[in-house]
A protein has these predicted regions:
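Alpha-helical scaffolds flanking conserved acidic
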Residues: 112-119, 288-298
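Acidic/His-rich structured neighborhood in mature extracellular/periplasmic domains
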Residues: 114-121, 125-233
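Alpha-helical segment that forms one wall of the substrate-binding/catalytic cleft
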Residues: 174-190, 201-207, 213-289, 298-306
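N-terminal signal peptide c-region/cleavage motif recognized by signal peptidases
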Residues: 40-44
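Bacterial N-terminal signal peptides that target proteins for export
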Residues: 21-33
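Catalytic and substrate-binding regions of cell-wall glycan-acting enzymes that process beta-1,4-linked
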Residues: 133-134, 139-157, 290-338
C-alpha cells in the first residue's frame, strides 16, 4: 500500500512526520468504526422495520441431539422403542379424521399453522407417554378426575394459603393470568425454592412440580400433555379465544378437566404455541412460525420468554432439541396427516 493511501491524504509522508501519520491513522480508524456502526445500526433497523428475522425451515443439527435418559428409561421399561411410539401416534392421527378436523379448527382460532399442533402431539407421545389406541380413553380419565376431591398445595398448606404470603404481594398488580402466574413462579424461584421459610422447608424443584402435581411428580395429562400451572397461565387467552371458563387454582378438578378433555386440551396446546411464537417475536425479534421443530422444542421445554431473552443476548438462530428434531425430520409425513 502506498504512503499517500496509508496516511489517508493525498500527500507524501515526511521523514519526521510519523507522529502526524499516526494521528491521521487514529482519526481514520475512528471514522471507519463510526461508519461501520452506522451501517450496522441501519441494517438492523431496516431488518426490524421490514419485519422480523425469519427462522428457516429444517434442522440446524445434522444428527438428532441426545435424548434424555429419563425418556429412554421410560421407553425401555415399556418394552417398546421410539420408532414404535412414533408410528403408533402417527397411525392414531391418520385414522382419526375428527381429531384432525378439530386440530385444524383450533389452530385457525389461534392464528397458527396446524402442523405446529401435530408436531407437539407427536413429540409428546413419542418421548413422554404412549399413545392411546382410542382417543375416548382421555374422556374416561377426565371424568374420573373430575369426580375426585383433591387440591393443589404442598403438605398441609394449600395453594391459596401459600399465595397469601407477603412475598407474593407484588404480583397482585397483574390482572392477566400469564403475567400473574409468571410473576408467582418468579417469586417461588427467588424466595422459596430450596429454602426454609416461615418454618417450612421447600424442595429444590419447579413450582409446578411442588404445588400443582398432587398425584406424582412430572405430571402432565391429556392429548397435549399440559401441566396444571401452564393451563393456569394460559387461562385468560383460552377464555378469550375459545370461550372456555377461566381456571381457578382453588378448583383443581376443573383444571384437570381442562387439560384432559381432548377439545379443551387442544385449545391450551394452541395457546401455548401461540405464546411461544409471540414471545420470540417480541423478545428476540425472531419469527419461528415456519419452523415446527422450534415450536415443538419450546412446547417440550417451556420457558419461551426466558429462552427468547437468552437468544436475543447471544445472537444467532434458535436450535431444535431432540424432540423438535424429530418433528422437522418427519415433517413431510406429518404434513400429509393434514
Amino acid at each position: 500500500m502506498s504512503e499517500s493511501v496509508w496516511n489517508g491524504f493525498q500527500h507524501p509522508v515526511p521523514e519526521n512526520g510519523i507522529v502526524e501519520v499516526l494521528g491521521h491513522a487514529k482519526i481514520l480508524k475512528r471514522i471507519l468504526l463510526a461508519l461501520i456502526l452506522v451501517v450496522a445500526t441501519s441494517a438492523a433497523s431496516s431488518a426490524f422495520a421490514g419485519g422480523l428475522t425469519m427462522v428457516p425451515e429444517g434442522n440446524r443439527h445434522a444428527e438428532q441431539p441426545k435424548i434424555p435418559g429419563a425418556s429412554v428409561r421410560r421407553t425401555r421399561a415399556g418394552r417398546t422403542t421410539f420408532d414404535d411410539k412414533y408410528e403408533k401416534i402417527r397411525d392414531l392421527l391418520a385414522s382419526d379424521k375428527k381429531l384432525i378436523a378439530k386440530v385444524r379448527s383450533t389452530a385457525a382460532d389461534y392464528g397458527i399453522d396446524p402442523i405446529h399442533m401435530i408436531g407437539a402431539i407427536v413429540g409428546e407421545h413419542t418421548y413422554n407417554v404412549d399413545a392411546y389406541d382410542r382417543l375416548q380413553t382421555y374422556y374416561v380419565k377426565a371424568a374420573a378426575y373430575a369426580g375426585n376431591s383433591f387440591r393443589f398445595g404442598y403438605g398441609d398448606e394449600s395453594i391459596q394459603q401459600f399465595l397469601d404470603r407477603p412475598e407474593f404481594s407484588k404480583c397482585g398488580d397483574f390482572a392477566d393470568s400469564y403475567k400473574l402466574w409468571t410473576c408467582r413462579e418468579g417469586v417461588w424461584e427467588k424466595s422459596f425454592r430450596g429454602r426454609s421459610v416461615g418454618g417450612t422447608s421447600f424442595p429444590d424443584n419447579r413450582f409446578s412440580a411442588v404445588f400443582f402435581q398432587p398425584f406424582y411428580a412430572g405430571q402432565t395429562f391429556g392429548l397435549g400433555q399440559v401441566n396444571p400451572l401452564t393451563a393456569l397461565m394460559l387461562s385468560d387467552m383460552v377464555a378469550r379465544t375459545s370461550g372456555y371458563p377461566k381456571l381457578d387454582e382453588n378448583k383443581a378438578a376443573a383444571v384437570y378437566d381442562a387439560i384432559m378433555d381432548p377439545d379443551k386440551s387442544l385449545a391450551y396446546m394452541a395457546a401455548s404455541i401461540r405464546r411461544s411464537i409471540d414471545d420470540y417475536k417480541s423478545i428476540a425479534g425472531m419469527d419461528i412460525s415456519r419452523n415446527p421443530g422450534i415450536t415443538a422444542t419450546l412446547y417440550n421445554t417451556g420457558g419461551s420468554p426466558q429462552r427468547a431473552a437468552a437468544l436475543a443476548a447471544r445472537g444467532g438462530l434458535p436450535e431444535e432439541n431432540y424432540y423438535g428434531w424429530l418433528v422437522n425430520d418427519k415433517l413431510a409425513e406429518l404434513k400429509s396427516l393434514l
